[in-house]
Amino acid sequence: MKAILIPFLSLLIPLTPQSAFAQSEPELKLESVVIVSRHGVRAPTKATQLMQDVTPDAWPTWPVKLGWLTPRGGELIAYLGHYQRQRLVADGLLAKKGCPQSGQVAIIADVDERTRKTGEAFAAGLAPDCAITVHTQADTSSPDPLFNPLKTGVCQLDNANVTDAILSRAGGSIADFTGHRQTAFRELERVLNFPQSNLCLKREKQDESCSLTQALPSELKVSADNVSLTGAVSLASMLTEIFLLQQAQGMPEPGWGRITDSHQWNTLLSLHNAQFYLLQRTPEVARSRATPLLDLIKTALTPHPPQKQAYGVTLPTSVLFIAGHDTNLANLGGALELNWTLPGQPDNTPPGGELVFERWRRLSDNSQWIQVSLVFQTLQQMRDKTPLSLNTPPGEVKLTLAGCEERNAQGMCSLAGFTQIVNEARIPACSL
């Protein structure tokens, strides 16, 4: 763990009346916020021979190592931190000027370079020139079970149950799943110029059909610690995400200049979202993987005397920022039955996307209420590197906890109702 002191963005808090941006009902007071964020724009995590075999064109180079956060990705995250500071000032949670009080803001990050740097960039945007510690587990060379208890052996998947659940969501089989998405696969083949690829030309010489789904059959693989898909589905998810990362990185010709409108982006990223729908949002997977984060979120949102937790943070606190991965957002969505699509953003779990949990207190009776939302930069905001503020905000989608039995006039779920939903979603064997 280290304290950082980063002069990144000047903190300009406009003197805007609180009522313009805070809750319309003045009897509600914001008391605590938990933000679970995907890391920012990164380089691809791998460069495989298969990636080259499916296109005649060379893949562009990146300015950082595989899987690392790019400097531009850090800037985009800092913009989100800057926006959140303005919003939290408007809602009365943070002061307009100066650094947050000691312990008022806590940041936890997974051990990867891209997540640690995301925590630093968010801190730089939220509180420039302030020493804020980015906490990780002590051993940064090993996976952190907070973000994946399966990978670390805390708990195991039930192979038969998970297989049945995923195949049911797929429509009966993975072949059915790919069959219903041929339009999107054809669009990917067009962007790749797949007919001129080594893989396709080789198949044609052998009088074999040249399509991604036939050349690369997909198979579901379930083990005690992971679920995955092989073949065209897995490849398509990775490649379409890479195209989006190219666009967000500001590269001159994402997808070799062959992606030109929002319809094409939505069609391509539907393949990425579809894989996440199967592998990360299926409740039989999501509930296990999300349990440690659910426990942490519940602890952070529940009023109680301050207690020091793992990572050295004291909870509850005003703001808890957790820098993780797209899988974490999808797992939490699947476990809590939160569903969303993002206007202007084809990726349902985009770089820098934030699943935000807020606890509000009703002043008339001190009752506690939970609001959940998804805050995200649109693809155009990423492309243009648009600075964010209350006047130029990121996208935001308010989410509904389907199982909540008690709501207030603003649609928030009671803290008791939220706690019950979390307790029913979590898998005790996967707790830390």
Curated annotation (Swiss-Prot):
Result of mutating R42G? Loss of activity with phytate as substrate
Q: Which GO terms describe its cellular component?
A: outer membrane-bounded periplasmic space
Keyword set for this entry? Disulfide bond, Hydrolase, Periplasm, Signal
Q: What happens when you mutate K46 to A/G? A: Retains 40% of wild-type activity with phytate as substrate
Q: What residue range is the signal peptide?
A: 1-22
Q: What is the effect of changing H39N?
A: Loss of activity with pNPP as substrate
* Reported impact of C404S: Retains less than 10% of wild-type activity
Temperature dependence, free-text field: Optimum temperature is 55 degrees Celsius for phytase activity. Optimum temperature is 60 degrees Celsius for phytase activity.
Check the record and name the InterPro entries matching this protein: Acid_Pase_AS, His_Pase_clade-2, His_PPase_superfam, Histidine_acid_phosphatase
Q: Where does 1D-myo-inositol hexakisphosphate bind?
A: R38, R42, A43, P44, T45, K46, R114, R289, H325, D326, T327
The family database entries (Pfam families) matched by this protein are listed as: His_Phos_2
Residue ranges spanning the membrane: these are none
Which residues catalyse the reaction?
Answer: H39, D326
Activity's sensitivity to pH is recorded as: Optimum pH is 4.5 for phytase activity. Optimum pH is 2.5 for acid phosphatase activity. Optimum pH is 2.5-3.0 for acid phosphatase activity.
Q: To what use is this protein put?
A: The properties of the phytase including the low pH optimum, protease resistance and high activity, demonstrate that the enzyme is a good candidate for industrial production as a feed enzyme and is therefore of potential commercial interest.
> In the record, what terms sit under GO molecular function?
4-phytase activity; acid phosphatase activity; GTPase activity; inositol phosphate phosphatase activity; nucleotidase activity; sugar-phosphatase activity
Superkingdom as given in the UniProt entry: Bacteria
| Activity control | Contains three consecutive and one non-consecutive disulfide bonds and shows a strong dependence on DsbC for its full activity. Competitively inhibited by tartaric acid and by sodium fluorid.
**Which reaction does this enzyme catalyse, per its entry?**
1D-myo-inositol hexakisphosphate + H2O = 1D-myo-inositol 1,2,3,4,5-pentakisphosphate + phosphate; 1D-myo-inositol 1,2,3,4,5-pentakisphosphate + H2O = 1D-myo-inositol 2,3,4,5-tetrakisphosphate + phosphate; 1D-myo-inositol 2,3,4,5-tetrakisphosphate + H2O = 1D-myo-inositol 2,4,5-triphosphate + phosphate; 1D-myo-inositol 2,4,5-triphosphate + H2O = 1D-myo-inositol 2,5-bisphosphate + phosphate
SUPFAM superfamilies per the record? Phosphoglycerate mutase-like
Q: How changing H325A affects the protein? A: Shows residual activity with pNPP as substrate
Question: Which family does the record assign?
Answer: Belongs to the histidine acid phosphatase family.
Task: Tell me what this protein is called.
Answer: Phytase AppA
- Origin organism is Escherichia coli (strain K12)
Q: What is the lineage of its organism?
A: Bacteria, Pseudomonadati, Pseudomonadota, Gammaproteobacteria, Enterobacterales
Query: What's the encoding gene here?
Result: appA
